[in-house]
């Protein structure tokens, strides 16, 4: 039998928290990129993107960048950066948005996007994903 589980390992929790915080920083940088490509103030950009998630921010940046940068080297470089952000977010989401569960008197698992159970990542594995996000 497998049941929902809240991890208690301090190293896992540290790594999980840092990954979550690093991703919040990434989203903030995407908001600041909206500011730059839209040529608006910080406050205006923050207000305009307040409830936008990572995907919506990347899509908004792509649209604004095509308009403001045209077919340029800068646009291609920005598009490549946005693709790396998308991959980093997907890796982070594997851990943050999935269920953690434990077998009775057994191992701890995380459910994958394809509804399979895999071992809970270690703190060093989470640190590696955090480094991708940063």
Residue ranges and their predicted role:
Residues 8, 70, 74-77:
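Juxtamembrane loop-transmembrane helix junctions in multi-pass integral membrane proteins
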Residues 109-134:
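Amphipathic, Lys/Arg-enriched alpha-helical patches that create a basic surface
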């Amino acid at each position: 039998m497998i049941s929902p589980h809240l991890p208690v390992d301090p190293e896992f929790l540290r790594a999980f928290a840092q990954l979550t915080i690093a991703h919040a920083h990434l989203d903030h940088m995407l908001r600041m990129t909206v500011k730059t490509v839209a040529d608006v103030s910080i406050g205006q950009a923050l207000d305009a993107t307040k409830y936008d998630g990572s995907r919506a921010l990347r899509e908004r940046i792509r649209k604004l960048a095509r308009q403001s940068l045209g077919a340029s080297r800068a646009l291609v470089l920005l598009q490549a950066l946005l693709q790396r952000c998308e991959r980093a977010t997907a890796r982070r989401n594997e851990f943050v948005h999935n269920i953690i569960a434990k077998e009775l008197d057994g191992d701890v698992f995380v459910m994958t996007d394809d509804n399979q159970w895999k071992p809970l990542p270690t703190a060093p594995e989470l640190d590696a994903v955090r480094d991708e996000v940063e």
